[in-house]
Structures are given as C-alpha cells and as structure tokens.
Amino acid sequence: MRYLNNAKKSILLIFGNILIGISCYAQMGVLKGNIYLKQNGEPVAGAGIFPVNDKSLGVASDADGSYEINLPVGKQTIVYTLTGLKNDTLTLDIKDGTEAIRNIYLTSNLKNLNVVVVSASKYEQRIENITVSMEVISPKLIENRNTTNVTSVLEQTPGVTILDQEPQIRGGSGFSFGVGSRVATLIDGLPIMTGDAGRTEWQFIPVENIEQIEVIKGASSVLYGSSALSGTINFRTAYPKERYHTYLRTYGGVYDKPSNREAKWWDGPATFSGINFLHSEKINRWDLIIGGNGLYDHGFIGPPLAMSSLPFQDTTISNNDVASRWGRLNFNIRHRFKNIEGLSAGINGNFMQSHSNFSLVWANDSTGIYNAFPKTMTLTDSKAFYIDPYISLTGKKGSSHQLRSRIFYADNDNGNDQSNKTNVYLAEYRFNRELISLGRLNVTSGVYFQQSFSHASLYAGSGNDKNTLENYAAFIQLEKKLIKKLMVSAGFRAEYFEMNNKESQLEPILRAGLNYQLTEGTFIRCSYGQGYRYPTIAEKYIETGAGGISVFPNPEVQPESSWNAEAGIKQGFKIGNFFGFADIAVFEQRYHNTIEYIYALWQPDQLAGFKFVNTGNSRVKGLEVSIMGEGKPVRNFAISFLGGYTYTLPQSLEPDYIFATDNPPTDFLPDSLSYSSTSTDTSKNILKYRFQHIAKMDIELTWKFISFGYGVRYYSFMKNIDKKFYDLDETVLPTGVKAYREKNDKGTLVHDLRLGFKLSEIFKASFLVNNATNLEYSLRPLKIESPRNYTIQLTAAF
C-alpha cells in the first residue's frame, strides 16, 4: 500500500506540474514551404531544418519536399541541410501567431537519403551522425504491407526477428515463452511492456499513427534502462501538419488451405478483416489526433486436437473461440501556449479490448500441425489502456525540459487460475542543452522512475498474489564534436531496483561512442555499451501448469547483464535520383548470468517442469550489412528499398558449467544441468533458439499510378533447442518435433507480393499475397507459421 500511495503521489505531482504549465503562455510562429533540388526542381525529402540556436526544434521535409517548423518569435537563422547537398541558411523575423512561407533550392554535391532520428541520444540527429547501429522504418512501408500488427513490418527489418511475438536483435536473445524481453519496446521514448512479465502487447501499438519506427541494435540501457539488453524498438507517434489529414484503411482477406491439405481444420473460408482510421488537425494552438482500429481474424491455428492416447483431454475450446477480435482507440492532444516561448503540454492515450489465443505446442507434426496440443492453448480476454500526460519547455538559448509520464493498466482474463492484472506508473524528466561556451557540448540528462504492481494468483510463488517491482534511475549523456568531423559521445546511468520491499539492487551502466566523417558521404563509427536487466515478477514467482507442463518459481534468479562493442561504416550514395545508405558493421555482445527457461524435475513430489535459472556466460559476435534508399531514377518511376544480411555466432562460453541440479525422489541420483546436458546440438556450442544467417529484402516499384512490392526473408536452420522437448516427444508430449526438425533442416525462404493501384488523389487499392509459395514452416519450434493468405486493401487519404 505504501508503494501505491507513493505512485499516486508521483502521478499527482506530474499532473500538478502540467496544470502549472497550463497557467502560462508562449509566443510562437510558423515557417513553412518546400525544398527542391536546384539542378532539376525535384522535391527533396528528408532534409533537416532547424534554427541554429535550438536544434531540438528541428524537423525533416516530407516526401513531397514540404516542411513546417514552429519557431519562437524574433530574429531566427534557419539551416537547411542534407548530406551530399550544400547547406543553405535563411534569416528572418518570426512574428507571433503568423505564418511565413519560404521555398528553398539546395545545390547538389553528392546526394544522399537523410533520416532524422531521436532514439540514439534522446534528441534529434541525422542518422549518419549517430554512434550506434540503427534501422528506421517509414510509415509508407507500414501501410504498403497492410500492417495490422507491427510484428509483420519489424520482421522485414534487417537484424530483427520476431520469434512467436518475442523480439530478437542480432541473436541477442533466445525464446523465453513470452517472459522477460531482452529488447526494450517504447512508444514515444517510454516503455510499453507489461509490468509483471516484461512482455510487449504488439496489437496495442497504434499502427495508424506512427511517424517512424527506430530500431537501435546493441545494448542501450544507459538511455532506456532495464530490458534494453540487446536493443531498443521505439515507435514515434505523429502530430498534425499545418493542413488537416484524414486517413482510412479497410481490408479483408482469407487464409489459403495449408500445403498439407489434411492439416486443414476449418470448414468454409478462414477470413480476416479490419479497419483503421486517423484524423489529425490543428485548431488554433491545439494539435489534435484521434485514431483507432478494429479487427476480426478467424486464425489459422485451431483448438486442441482430441487425442485418445492421452490421459487428459481438452474439449472446452471451439473453432469460434480461437478467432481473434480487438478494438482500439487512441488520441494525442497538445496545446502550444502563447506568451512563454516554447511551452507546450498535452496528453496522449490508447485504449484496447481484445480476445486472442496463445498456442504453446502443436498437436503433432503432420495432420495436427495447425492445431494445439491438449491443455496447451490459452484464451485471453484483455482490457488495456495507457494515459501519457506531459509538458515541454524549450528555452531561447537552446535548452529544453521535458516531463513525460505514463499510467499503463492491463487486465488479462485467461481462466485456469492464470489471469493477471498489472498497473505501471512511470515518469521521466529529461533536460537537453547545447553548451556553446564549451564548444557546442550537447548534454542530455534526466531522472526516471517506474513502479509496477501485479495482482495474480499466477505469481503466488512469492507467497502472495500481490507483487511490486520498483525502478529508479538517473542518467546523463554528453556529445561533442572534438574536431570538425569527429563526434564523441559518452553516457552513464545508475539503476536501482526493489522487489516486494525485500530485495534491492543498485547498478551503474556506461556507454561511449565515436563517429568520424571520412568524406562527404562516408561515416565511420565505433561504440561500446553496457546492458542490464533485472528479473521480472514472472521470472521469479510464476507458478502454474498446463498439459503436463508445469512452471515453477525461482526467487533466487539473479539479474543478467551484457556489454556490446561494434564498429561500422555508413556510406551515402546516389545513383541518378536514387538516394540511399549502405551500412556494414561487425559486433560482439557478451552476456553474464544469462536467464533461461530450463526443464527438469525441480520438486520430488511433483511432475517435472520449467523454471527460470541463470545459466552462465555467453557470447554473440557477427557481421551485418544493410541498405536503404528511395528516389526517382526516371520520370514517373520511383523506387524504395530496404534490405540486409545478418550473420551471428551465438555461443555458450561455459558449455560444461553446472548451473543447477534437479531434485528427484529419494533413491534417485540428481542430474547435473549444463548447456551440454540441456541442448539438442552441442557442436560449436551454439546457443538455443537462434538463427545464424538471416537475409531480408523489401522493394517497392512505382510507375505512375501502379506500384509493385516484393518482400523476401531467409532464415537458416535453428540448430539448437531444449533437449527436453525431444525427451518429452517420446513420453508425455508426443508432438513429433524431432522428426519435423530432422526433415526440415535446410533453412526457410518466405516470399510476399503486393500490387497497388492509385485510383485517384484520394483512393488507393492494393492486393497482397503473403507466403506466396504456401510454404509450411516453423520459426519457433512447436509453433507453425501462417499458410498463404490473400488480402484486398482500400485506403483513402484526404
């Protein structure tokens, strides 16, 4: 109760600060226009526009070259910049409440695609200037792929794999059954993972209102805290442009029959359909956005299969029960005040109600591969929302203050004593300033707190169905150009955790990086960063069971940590009017006290089951190449491209280290548990649930009103999984997993196709085919992926 009161006081303090801010006023004006290439008049997309005395106000030009920037009143000098183009400056007087229109013509040297990001340092930077590896996904790709769940577009991103809803970046994590993500997931820079299990609810992400997705590869705990052990995915939501915008997308589709016709469990068509909408508008000094979506999905994984050979059956789930349904509504509201320069305040929100299923194990490897094994499917009815109050103040001398907060609530009704409710209260104060007197030293610092409260009998392993986890942190990051072309950055974070008022941990975290501009379009970088992850409530205290599979608590599990080092080079290029970046990086990640989900006989008077334990030290090293670009090489013809290849060598450094022993009945000798004894393939000591080779490409070709898109993904064979799944295959869990993996050991190649027609300035129609070859494939062992499916999509934007 003490923690709940503290959380309420903290939230009230945040709201109080916002109300104080609302009593003040600010003076702002607007500068807008278009940016063109002087040589041919083509619009320039992605150019950076910022005032020299406050880069944090910077914006980027849109695909048509248009831009709009809010500026404090008074005399302002504006810089227009794009790598490979000559910078231009403009000096003018900004007047309160007025609009100035200026068109700018930039001259070419070498022309490159420019992307403005914020995730790397928590302030806006051009992507070629950052010291870490990052991929940026545009809203155009999200729309073109008919994205209803962001995992489908993340799966197309180089270096990123979504393994049954769990994100992996460069092989930095395996599979942990939905608990304890090693990748931090953020919306507008704040975590959006559940407070009990550290899991991301992907359908909760507002896909209709994403400005861009930024993926940081490698440990990034200095800025984003626990869970950013191997990377970060940040979803940046958009705010209105000067002109109102309304967007509607509706779609319908059907799953094809599986290539193994005998595995089809449904009668009639297996359909899915949905609608997305968004309206954004500026009304005087108010910025307003409202959006949402609704979806129905029959699904391709059916209810548990009747199996007479088992001592238990599961006939309570029907075909209709497994269909997914959800509705979501979100809003962004911001007010820009009149009489105090740079002051704004607002509130964002997102509400969702859903019905979904989770299948842990398929029924068998042939006719039951699209059905669940008895007692291993969970139906969930969820209600969730978050509310984000915030206030921001940008000063005349380039300083900025931001106070952002989030109230996140999730209620999952799973039945079978597995239901859970969590409340998360979090807030971050962040200060940023460029210190001119210290040679333009950029300082980003702040404090952060998060309090998570869980109420669930699922976590009674603590001795109570109510559990709390608190996290407090302070951080600072410094960036400076030591010489004209060398950028140096360094950061520090102190993290404090407390679980149930019984145990606590204080941990320092460091990072550093260099970026050197070798030529006009060539940037060399290197970086080192530490990561740290405290165990979740679920990892310590979960206690449940299903289908002969039990899960045991482990209050003794310890935090895991990592460090990441990499060196890379980013090369801008131009081929005609096609602009792009090519990037190559080599990296190494080390993990200490790695947490894994291990199956054993943990208690002599109960069935065997899984438990989270620390398994020792491991290493992932590798190489990654990626290319992104877009442009118009000839008149009426446009190309956009995103592709890459990732090689990883994920290895256990202590394959014979005994991290635990089981606890058999009397008169039986305990088994020693190590990497070697719990793995199906110990050659080269490859870690479990990793792909060593991943290649991806997405290309969109547009000619006049017709567009064609092609996406392809390759995954090498997953060499190593938990050996116990093979052992159980011969006893209580006859799934055929061993035979399936022996038969399908050559890797997986998946193709997607799409065709679009721009019917008018408002309407566009598209036809999409995912898994075009109707390949039967599994990425996460014991879970089949979707058969071929067809979608018709209609969008309207005005």
Stretch-by-stretch model annotation:
Residues 36-40, 47-52, 81-85, 95, ...:
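Short, acidic, small-residue-rich periplasmic hinge/interaction motif at the N-terminus
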Residues 67-70, 190-217:
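Short acidic/polar hinge/loop motifs at secondary-structure boundaries
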Residues 100-105, 150-153, 168-170, 183-186, ...:
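N-terminal periplasmic accessory domains that precede
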Residues 134, 151-190, 194:
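Extracytoplasmic beta-strand/coil segments of soluble accessory domains associated
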Residues 249, 586-590, 611-723:
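Gram-negative outer-membrane beta-barrel transporters
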Residues 297-330, 334-394, 400-401, 408-426:
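Flexible loop and strand-edge segments within Gram-negative outer membrane beta-barrel domains
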Residues 391, 440-442, 462-589, 698-700:
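Structural signature of Gram-negative outer-membrane beta-barrels, strongest in the C-terminal barrel
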Residues 402-412, 451, 517, 525, ...:
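Membrane-embedded beta-barrel scaffold of Gram-negative outer-membrane proteins
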